[in-house]
């Protein structure tokens, strides 16, 4: 189940929160939801070069507050705040209520799943090899503190006629653990051969619903829980201790008779140089 479901939707109300936070009755719900979809599509097109990771929309009483998380806040704000004012007026006209726009900076864009997916998509559109782009993104994420990352690309990779999927993983990515903080991102690369989809999962550690960090497992505890592993990462059987030569498998009970020793009967030797067996000597 954890392998197929959307990681963010699977963890809602546990460790993750909704991207649209407002309440509406039955008569206004469809209208407000449609406005949210239009706003997100507009921001995705308008701020295509601003490296926007996610957008949160809140609707207090007869107002709207939009928080934009970007690794390049200067591109969103513009020179002397001109671009942000144009953006506010466009969003106010679109939503029909006063809109307040907040800009939050993403400190580590190399560990943000959505930014990683967008970066790989841009590289594929520039005809960079998909394996090189994926492995470079994984190395940067692990170097900056991610505990695990998985990247999957699907489509006509390298222009082949039959579409296929390829994925790479480094570290741990526990998709079925609810307390695991999994960041998920999706991007599309529009190449001359067609659209290539990129999915990214980034594991940033465990987090409890209360916000308290969980108890860290030591290396010995993790080995006892998971068992020893081989060099290729697959589980293996526990090593068996070598039995000393001549030592019985189990200790005999006191006073018990010694175990009988099994002796294999030897076959009679074949006749050598025409010798006759002893049984046939008198015939």
From Swiss-Prot:
Output the GO biological process annotations, alphabetical, semicolon-separated: translation
Tell me which UniProt keywords the record has, alphabetically: Ribonucleoprotein, Ribosomal protein, RNA-binding, rRNA-binding
Q: Which SMART domains match?
A: KH
Q: Is Methyltransferase one of the keywords UniProt gives this record?
A: no
Spell out the PROSITE patterns in the cross-references: KH_TYPE_2, RIBOSOMAL_S3
> Which family is this sequence assigned to?
Belongs to the universal ribosomal protein uS3 family.
Task: Please explain the role this protein plays, according to its UniProt record.
Answer: Binds the lower part of the 30S subunit head. Binds mRNA in the 70S ribosome, positioning it for translation.
Which Pfam families does UniProt cross-reference here?
A: KH_2, Ribosomal_S3_C
Molecular-function GO term, any one: structural constituent of ribosome
Stretches of Low complexity bias are at: 244-260
Record flagged with keyword Membrane = no
Q: Which domain of life is it from?
A: Bacteria
Compositional bias (Basic and acidic residues) at which positions? 217-235
Gene Ontology cellular-component terms listed: cytosolic small ribosomal subunit
Q: Report the InterPro entries cross-referenced here.
A: KH_dom, KH_dom-like_a/b, KH_dom_type_2, KH_sf_prok-type, Ribosomal_S3_C_sf, Ribosomal_uS3_bac-typ, Ribosomal_uS3_C, Ribosomal_uS3_CS
Q: Which residues form a coiled coil?
A: none
Which stretches make up the KH type-2 domain?
A: 39-107
What does the annotation say about its assembly with partners? Part of the 30S ribosomal subunit. Forms a tight complex with proteins S10 and S14.
Q: What is this protein called?
A: Small ribosomal subunit protein uS3
């Amino acid at each position: 189940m954890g392998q197929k479901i959307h990681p963010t939707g699977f963890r809602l109300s546990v460790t993750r929160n909704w991207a649209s936070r407002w309440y509406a009755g039955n008569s206004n719900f469809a209208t407000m939801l449609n406005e949210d979809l239009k706003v997100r599509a507009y921001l995705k097109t308008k701020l295509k070069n601003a490296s926007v990771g996610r957008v949160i929309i809140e609707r207090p009483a007869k107002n709207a507050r939009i928080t934009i998380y970007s690794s390049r806040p200067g591109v969103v704000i513009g020179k002397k705040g001109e671009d942000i004012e144009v953006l506010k007026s466009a969003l106010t006209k679109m939503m029909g209520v006063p809109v307040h726009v907040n800009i939050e900076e993403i400190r580590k864009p190399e560990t943000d799943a959505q930014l990683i997916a967008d970066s790989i998509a841009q590289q594929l559109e520039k005809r960079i090899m998909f394996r090189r782009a994926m492995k470079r993104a994984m190395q940067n994420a692990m170097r900056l503190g991610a505990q695990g990352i998985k990247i999957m690309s699907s489509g006509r990779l390298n222009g082949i006629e039959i579409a296929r999927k390829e994925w790479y993983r480094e570290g741990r990515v526990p998709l079925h653990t609810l307390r695991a903080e999994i960041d998920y991102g999706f991007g599309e690369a529009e190449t001359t051969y067609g659209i290539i989809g990129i999915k990214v999962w980034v594991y940033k550690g465990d987090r409890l619903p209360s916000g308290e960090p969980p108890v860290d497992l030591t290396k010995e505890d993790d080995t006892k829980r998971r068992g020893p592993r081989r060099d290729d990462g697959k589980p293996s059987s526990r090593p068996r201790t070598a039995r000393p030569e001549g030592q019985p498998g189990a200790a005999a009970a006191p006073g018990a008779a010694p175990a009988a020793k099994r002796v294999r009967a030897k076959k009679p030797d074949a006749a050598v140089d025409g010798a006759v067996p002893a049984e046939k000597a008198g015939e």
